[in-house]
Amino acid sequence: LIILESTSPVGTTEMLAHWLADLRPDLRFPVSGQDDVEVQIAYCPERVLPGQVMRELISNDRIIGGLTQRCTARATDFYRIFVEGDCVATNARTAEMCKLSENSFRDVNIAFANELSIICDQLDINVWELIQLANRHPRVNILQPGAGVGGHCIAVDPWFIVASSPENTRLIRTAREVNDGKPDWVVAKIANAMEQGSTVACFGLA
Protein backbone atom coordinates (compact mmCIF):
# COMPACT_ATOMS: atom_id res chain seq x y z
CA LEU A 1 0.00 0.00 0.00
CA ILE A 2 1.39 3.38 -1.08
CA ILE A 3 -0.30 6.57 0.15
CA LEU A 4 0.62 10.06 -1.05
CA GLU A 5 -0.20 12.83 1.44
CA SER A 6 1.75 15.80 0.03
CA THR A 7 -0.31 18.57 -1.56
CA SER A 8 -0.15 17.86 -5.28
CA PRO A 9 -1.69 18.92 -8.60
CA VAL A 10 -4.66 16.90 -9.79
CA GLY A 11 -3.45 13.75 -11.54
CA THR A 12 -0.26 13.33 -9.51
CA THR A 13 -1.34 10.03 -7.94
CA GLU A 14 -2.01 8.59 -11.39
CA MET A 15 1.40 9.78 -12.59
CA LEU A 16 3.00 8.18 -9.53
CA ALA A 17 1.44 4.84 -10.43
CA HIS A 18 2.80 5.06 -13.99
CA TRP A 19 6.29 6.01 -12.78
CA LEU A 20 6.37 3.09 -10.36
CA ALA A 21 5.05 0.71 -13.01
CA ASP A 22 7.87 1.75 -15.34
CA LEU A 23 10.46 1.29 -12.59
CA ARG A 24 9.09 -2.07 -11.43
CA PRO A 25 7.65 -3.97 -14.39
CA ASP A 26 7.70 -7.11 -12.25
CA LEU A 27 4.84 -5.74 -10.13
CA ARG A 28 1.23 -4.97 -11.05
CA PHE A 29 0.11 -1.38 -10.36
CA PRO A 30 -3.36 0.21 -10.79
CA VAL A 31 -2.36 2.19 -13.88
CA SER A 32 -5.53 1.59 -15.90
CA GLY A 33 -8.14 1.22 -13.19
CA GLN A 34 -7.77 -2.54 -12.88
CA ASP A 35 -8.22 -4.11 -9.43
CA ASP A 36 -6.04 -7.18 -10.01
CA VAL A 37 -2.85 -5.54 -8.74
CA GLU A 38 -0.13 -6.24 -6.20
CA VAL A 39 0.38 -2.62 -5.11
CA GLN A 40 -2.51 -0.42 -3.97
CA ILE A 41 -2.08 3.36 -4.38
CA ALA A 42 -4.16 6.14 -2.82
CA TYR A 43 -4.09 9.84 -2.00
CA CYS A 44 -5.01 11.28 1.40
CA PRO A 45 -4.13 14.96 1.92
CA GLU A 46 -2.72 15.90 5.30
CA ARG A 47 -4.74 18.42 7.29
CA VAL A 48 -2.59 19.48 10.22
CA LEU A 49 -1.73 22.72 11.96
CA PRO A 50 1.98 23.21 12.76
CA GLY A 51 2.47 22.71 16.48
CA GLN A 52 -0.54 20.41 16.73
CA VAL A 53 0.46 17.76 14.19
CA MET A 54 0.13 14.65 16.35
CA ARG A 55 -3.25 15.67 17.78
CA GLU A 56 -4.71 16.62 14.39
CA LEU A 57 -3.37 13.50 12.68
CA ILE A 58 -5.68 11.58 14.97
CA SER A 59 -8.67 13.89 15.43
CA ASN A 60 -9.20 15.40 11.96
CA ASP A 61 -11.45 13.89 9.30
CA ARG A 62 -9.54 12.35 6.39
CA ILE A 63 -10.45 12.39 2.70
CA ILE A 64 -9.16 9.18 1.09
CA GLY A 65 -9.09 8.61 -2.65
CA GLY A 66 -7.64 5.52 -4.28
CA LEU A 67 -6.92 4.82 -7.92
CA THR A 68 -9.48 2.01 -7.67
CA GLN A 69 -12.20 1.14 -5.19
CA ARG A 70 -9.98 -1.55 -3.70
CA CYS A 71 -7.17 0.99 -3.28
CA THR A 72 -9.58 3.32 -1.49
CA ALA A 73 -10.84 0.55 0.78
CA ARG A 74 -7.33 -0.61 1.66
CA ALA A 75 -6.17 2.93 2.48
CA THR A 76 -9.34 3.61 4.48
CA ASP A 77 -8.74 0.49 6.56
CA PHE A 78 -5.21 1.74 7.30
CA TYR A 79 -6.31 5.20 8.48
CA ARG A 80 -9.09 3.77 10.64
CA ILE A 81 -6.40 2.15 12.78
CA PHE A 82 -5.51 5.52 14.34
CA VAL A 83 -7.87 8.24 13.01
CA GLU A 84 -10.71 9.20 15.36
CA GLY A 85 -12.32 11.55 12.83
CA ASP A 86 -14.37 10.36 9.86
CA CYS A 87 -12.60 8.58 7.01
CA VAL A 88 -14.45 9.69 3.88
CA ALA A 89 -13.93 7.71 0.68
CA THR A 90 -13.68 9.19 -2.82
CA ASN A 91 -11.37 8.86 -5.83
CA ALA A 92 -7.80 10.11 -6.10
CA ARG A 93 -8.49 13.11 -8.33
CA THR A 94 -11.27 14.39 -6.09
CA ALA A 95 -9.10 13.96 -3.00
CA GLU A 96 -6.28 15.90 -4.66
CA MET A 97 -8.64 18.70 -5.69
CA CYS A 98 -10.21 18.75 -2.23
CA LYS A 99 -6.98 19.85 -0.53
CA LEU A 100 -6.32 22.50 -3.18
CA SER A 101 -9.90 23.77 -2.87
CA GLU A 102 -9.71 24.04 0.91
CA ASN A 103 -6.67 26.29 0.83
CA SER A 104 -7.87 28.26 -2.20
CA PHE A 105 -11.15 28.96 -0.40
CA ARG A 106 -9.23 30.40 2.52
CA ASP A 107 -6.99 32.41 0.19
CA VAL A 108 -9.95 33.96 -1.63
CA ASN A 109 -11.63 34.95 1.64
CA ILE A 110 -8.41 36.46 2.98
CA ALA A 111 -7.99 38.38 -0.28
CA PHE A 112 -11.46 39.89 0.15
CA ALA A 113 -10.54 41.16 3.61
CA ASN A 114 -7.18 42.46 2.41
CA GLU A 115 -8.69 44.25 -0.56
CA LEU A 116 -11.37 45.72 1.70
CA SER A 117 -8.66 47.15 3.96
CA ILE A 118 -7.02 48.89 1.00
CA ILE A 119 -10.35 50.34 -0.15
CA CYS A 120 -11.19 51.53 3.37
CA ASP A 121 -7.81 53.19 3.70
CA GLN A 122 -8.49 55.15 0.52
CA LEU A 123 -12.01 56.11 1.65
CA ASP A 124 -10.94 57.02 5.21
CA ILE A 125 -13.00 54.25 6.83
CA ASN A 126 -11.92 52.20 9.85
CA VAL A 127 -11.79 48.71 8.35
CA TRP A 128 -11.85 47.00 11.76
CA GLU A 129 -15.06 48.76 12.75
CA LEU A 130 -16.54 48.08 9.32
CA ILE A 131 -15.86 44.34 9.53
CA GLN A 132 -17.19 44.16 13.07
CA LEU A 133 -20.42 45.82 11.97
CA ALA A 134 -20.77 43.79 8.76
CA ASN A 135 -20.26 40.56 10.69
CA ARG A 136 -23.32 41.32 12.78
CA HIS A 137 -25.27 40.06 9.76
CA PRO A 138 -26.12 36.42 10.56
CA ARG A 139 -24.75 35.14 7.24
CA VAL A 140 -21.63 37.31 6.93
CA ASN A 141 -18.24 36.38 8.34
CA ILE A 142 -15.54 38.62 6.87
CA LEU A 143 -12.04 37.63 7.97
CA GLN A 144 -9.47 39.98 9.49
CA PRO A 145 -7.13 41.69 6.98
CA GLY A 146 -3.39 41.37 7.37
CA ALA A 147 -0.10 41.86 5.60
CA GLY A 148 -0.69 39.06 3.13
CA VAL A 149 -0.74 35.27 3.39
CA GLY A 150 2.02 33.14 4.86
CA GLY A 151 2.63 29.49 5.57
CA HIS A 152 3.62 26.58 3.39
CA CYS A 153 0.26 25.91 1.74
CA ILE A 154 -2.21 28.75 1.28
CA ALA A 155 0.16 30.95 -0.73
CA VAL A 156 1.12 28.03 -3.01
CA ASP A 157 -1.79 25.64 -3.47
CA PRO A 158 -4.09 27.96 -5.49
CA TRP A 159 -1.47 28.12 -8.25
CA PHE A 160 -1.88 24.36 -8.80
CA ILE A 161 -5.53 24.96 -9.69
CA VAL A 162 -4.67 27.98 -11.85
CA ALA A 163 -2.05 25.98 -13.75
CA SER A 164 -4.50 23.13 -14.39
CA SER A 165 -7.22 25.39 -15.83
CA PRO A 166 -5.85 28.90 -16.48
CA GLU A 167 -8.83 30.03 -18.56
CA ASN A 168 -11.33 29.27 -15.77
CA THR A 169 -9.56 30.52 -12.65
CA ARG A 170 -9.86 34.31 -12.79
CA LEU A 171 -11.11 34.62 -9.21
CA ILE A 172 -8.45 32.32 -7.72
CA ARG A 173 -5.68 34.03 -9.69
CA THR A 174 -6.86 37.51 -8.70
CA ALA A 175 -7.03 36.51 -5.03
CA ARG A 176 -3.45 35.31 -5.21
CA GLU A 177 -2.36 38.58 -6.82
CA VAL A 178 -4.18 40.62 -4.15
CA ASN A 179 -2.54 38.70 -1.31
CA ASP A 180 0.88 38.66 -2.97
CA GLY A 181 0.71 42.44 -3.35
CA LYS A 182 -0.40 43.22 0.21
CA PRO A 183 3.11 43.12 1.80
CA ASP A 184 4.33 45.80 -0.62
CA TRP A 185 1.29 47.93 0.22
CA VAL A 186 1.99 47.61 3.95
CA VAL A 187 5.67 48.48 3.50
CA ALA A 188 4.73 51.55 1.45
CA LYS A 189 2.32 52.71 4.18
CA ILE A 190 5.04 52.32 6.81
CA ALA A 191 7.60 54.14 4.67
CA ASN A 192 5.23 57.07 4.14
CA ALA A 193 4.51 57.31 7.87
CA MET A 194 8.15 57.24 8.95
CA GLU A 195 10.25 60.27 9.63
CA GLN A 196 13.80 60.58 8.34
CA GLY A 197 16.19 58.48 10.43
CA SER A 198 13.47 56.46 12.14
CA THR A 199 14.33 53.07 13.61
CA VAL A 200 11.97 50.19 12.88
CA ALA A 201 11.74 47.13 15.16
CA CYS A 202 10.25 43.97 13.68
CA PHE A 203 8.72 41.54 16.16
CA GLY A 204 7.82 38.01 15.14
CA LEU A 205 9.50 38.34 11.76
CA ALA A 206 10.50 34.93 10.41
Name each model feature, range by range:
Residues 1-206:
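Structural/interface elements that position substrates and couple domains in central-metabolism enzymes
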